Amino acid sequence: MLPDGSEGELVFTSLSKEAMPIVRYRTRDLTRLLAPTSRSFRRMGKIVGRSDDMMIIRGVNVFPTQIEEIVLANASLTGLYQMHISRDGLLDTVEVHCELQPQRRGLGDAERGEIAQWVQQRIKTLVGISTAVRVFDPDTIERTQTGKARRVYDKRPR
């Protein structure tokens, strides 16, 4: 059990059955317990990510959902993005590819640069890593047969 407010993995344990083994179910969801109140049950914060999605980039724990929230916050972009992670010498580098909304097709380089800079600054502020950001026309990011885009391309040597 972690102290209140500390982020950790949500695990369910059955304690009410007698003569039954203790079974723990790992959800792999990351959350935190909120400070106790006068209620009889504890409150939990929102799910902030998944422990199996976490990547370590330059010593910072990064979840793809953090990048997704930032991309979705910009009305000029669709929710589709890709993270291309590579290693340059000893340092990890991240390039985020975003896709414009269909009505923004043909946007000039200056406007694309402003959008990319906005995303880049938000990632630096909220996630804590420096990235390069590229903004592409609609329907540029490759999708699978189900219509989803692969989110993370980790090209670092293992």
Report residues per predicted region.
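Active-site glycine/GP-rich loop and adjacent strand/helix microenvironment
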Residues: M1-R158
